[in-house]
Amino acid sequence: MSTNSNRKALIVGVTGISGQSIATKLLQDGWEVHGLSRRIEGLPAGVHHIKADLLDAAAMKAALAGLKPEIVFMTAWIKKDSEAENIEVNGATIQNLLDALEPDGGVRHVALQTGLKHYLGPFDNYANAVMAETPFHEDEPRLDVPNFYYTQEDILFEAAKKQGFTWSVHRSHTIFGYAVDNAMNMVLTLSVYAEIQKVLGRKFIFPGSTQAWNGVVDVTDADLLAEQLIWASTDKAGENQAFNIANGDTFRWRWLWPQIAAHFGVDYEGPKAEAFQPLEEQMKDAAPVWAEIAAKHGLAVSDVTKLASWWHSDSDLGRQIECFTDMTKSREAGFLNFRSSPKSFFSNVEAYRKANILPKN
C-alpha cells in the first residue's frame, strides 16, 4: 500500500459539518486533500479548494479534470421543498460528480454519507411508512416511499460497476460537530437557543414530542463519522458495504436536556403532552436578540440564521417514535471506535466558544 504522503483524496462538501472533520483527519495523516464546496469559509488550512456547482455537469468535469483522487468522500446535499425535488437535485449532484471522475483516473473508492432517513423516510413523509423495529440494522429492506438516499445509492452502485471502484455508504444519525452556516447543526442550534433564553429570562423548553423526550436515542460525533469514512475507504473490510454510524452509547433526552440547561445556566422545561413548542415558533423573533448578544460579546457571527437550524432540531426532536441504530456490523468488520455523546456535545460547545461563535462563560 502506498504511503499517505502520496495519497490524494477529494471531499465534496468540505466545509460542512462532516467534511471539515474528514479533511482535518486526512491532513493529520499526511494526505493531499482537495475539497469542493460552495464557499471557502470554514475550509481547513491545507486543503486545496475547488469551487464548482454540483448541478453543472460541464463545470464539474472542468473542475475535476486531471485531479485523479484515490478516494472520494461525498458529504454534500441540497435541501429542497419536496422529496421529488430532492431526488431530482441530489441524484444529479452525485451523478455529475461520478461522471466527472475519469474512468481511468485512479479512483479506488467512493464513500457516500447518507443518514437515518434511509430507515425513517424523507422529511415530507417522515416516519409515516411501516418501519423496522429499533435498533435499525443495515440489511432492513428499503421503505416503499421515494427517498433521495435510495436514488444516490443506486447511482453510486451503477457507477462502481462501470468505473471499477469500490464503495461504502455511511448512515449517520444527528451529527454533533463543528460548522458554521450548516443546514443541520443541533449542537450550535441548541446552544444559541439556550443563550437567547438565558438573556430573555425564559426557560430552556424541550421543543419536541414526549416520545422523543422519553425514548432511547443515539447521535453521531462528526469526528467519529470521519474516522469510519476513512476506515471504510482504506480497509478491505469496508469495501462495498453500508454501515450505520453512531457513537455507541444511547441516552434519553429527559436525561441530557437538564445537563445542557445546567451547562448554560438556564432553567429547563420538558415537553407538553398536548402540543409541541417548536423552536421555529419560539425563535421567530430571535434575530435582533442574537444580534445584541453578538455585539455585547464581540462574537464573530451576528446573523442567527447562519448558526441555528431551527427546522432541523424541530424535526429530530419532534419524532413520535424511538430512533437508534445497531452498530454490530461495523464492529464485526473491525471499526471499534466510539464516543461519549454528552462529551461530544459539550466539547463542541467549547470549540464554538473558543472560535468566538458562542459567548465565553
PLM segments and residue spans:
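Conserved Rossmann-fold NAD(P)-dependent oxidoreductase catalytic core, especially the SDR/UDP-sugar
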Residues: 85, 92-148, 168
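N-terminal Rossmann NAD(P)H-binding glycine-rich loop of SDR-like oxidoreductase domains
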Residues: 2, 6-29
